[in-house]
């Protein structure tokens, strides 16, 4: 249990499993370790959360995971206390800022000091293997490591594969995230009425997610009426009218940091859907049921693609970007 919500997840078991998944990928690729900046990857490796959205665009946190040896979290300057009690962490250090945002004109000087600390870890705990998987790193930082003999390799591929297969604890976490998301969807459904704006309706999902221990919502995909097509227009102050289709995609990061990615469409007001609305909804349902029936263990991506729902030509130009995608701490591979 964290300070934020109660959960049935066995956190210690989940942490052990996720860390071993990373190390299995490191061994398979003959890497000496990984250096992770992506907040979702840090969460997967350590379970420690700290201002994750801010950290998406500020490299203020990172974790070093050797194939064998101590896991060391580098956290934001005054936030080392946040990792207390996380049993898989051998050590928490203050992160060494190495971006222009934090260091200004002295950026190069601080960058070299950061690289020396990382290279020292590789020498101490890499067992002679200087291949380091890094998920997100600017070119100057990459070059600084390479000058010190570190061989920078692809950490994104490694982490996507590490995150592909969930254990029973993660399944519980995903179900809890879905339950929270469904509660938010119900809150939106109850609140929906003609005359409110898209933003006002969307706020009910955010409020419910936070109240139930959720974390954030990745996109703003709720539109109504003519704004539903083409898709990917963002939520706005448009006033919803009676009879409008209201469409949304939750992209919600819920309790335990797990994603619930649910799409729904409704008709606003006490209005019977038009024949065209019913036709479109029927095609969407046929698509879902057809593709879901294909999913089974051992199915290849190619077989799934070849047998997937034959989309009518009228929808091809504005079809979605993928048939299905993985999900976990975010949208994940395969996509």
Language-model region placement:
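Active-site neighborhoods and metal-handling regions in enzymes and metal-associated proteins
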Residues: 1-335
């Amino acid at each position: 249990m964290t300070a934020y919500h109660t959960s049935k997840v066995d956190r210690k078991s989940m942490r052990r499993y996720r860390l071993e998944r990373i190390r299995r990928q490191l061994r398979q690729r003959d890497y000496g370790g990984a250096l992770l900046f992506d907040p979702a990857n840090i969460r997967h490796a350590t379970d420690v959360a700290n201002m994750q959205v801010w950290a998406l665009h500020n490299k203020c946190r990172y974790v070093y995971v050797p194939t064998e040896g101590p896991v060391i979290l580098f956290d934001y300057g005054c936030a080392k206390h946040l990792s207390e009690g996380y049993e898989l962490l051998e050590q928490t250090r203050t992160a060494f800022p190495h971006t222009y945002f934090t260091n200004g004109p002295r950026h190069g000087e601080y960058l070299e000091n950061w690289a020396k600390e990382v290279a020292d870890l590789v020498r101490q705990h890499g067992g002679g293997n200087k291949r380091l998987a890094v998920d997100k790193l600017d070119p100057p930082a990459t070059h600084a490591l390479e000058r010190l003999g570190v061989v920078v390799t692809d950490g994104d591929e490694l982490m996507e594969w590490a995150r592909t297969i969930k254990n029973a604890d993660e399944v519980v976490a995903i179900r809890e995230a879905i339950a929270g998301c469904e509660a938010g969807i119900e809150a939106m459904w109850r609140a929906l009425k003609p005359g409110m704006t898209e933003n006002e309706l969307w706020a009910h999902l955010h409020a419910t997610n936070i109240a139930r221990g959720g974390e954030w919502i990745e996109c703003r995909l709720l539109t109504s009426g003519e704004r539903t097509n083409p898709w990917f227009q963002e939520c706005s102050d448009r006033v919803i009218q009676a009879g409008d289709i209201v469409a949304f995609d939750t992209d919600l990061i819920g309790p335990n940091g797990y994603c619930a990615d649910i799409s729904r469409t409704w008709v606003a007001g006490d209005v019977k859907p038009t024949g065209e609305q019913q036709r479109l909804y029927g095609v969407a349902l046929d698509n879902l049921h057809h593709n879901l029936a294909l999913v089974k263990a051992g199915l290849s991506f190619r077989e799934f693609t070849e047998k997937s729902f034959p989309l009518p030509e009228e929808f091809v130009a504005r079809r979605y970007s993928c048939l299905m995608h993985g999900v976990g701490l975010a949208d994940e591979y395969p996509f």
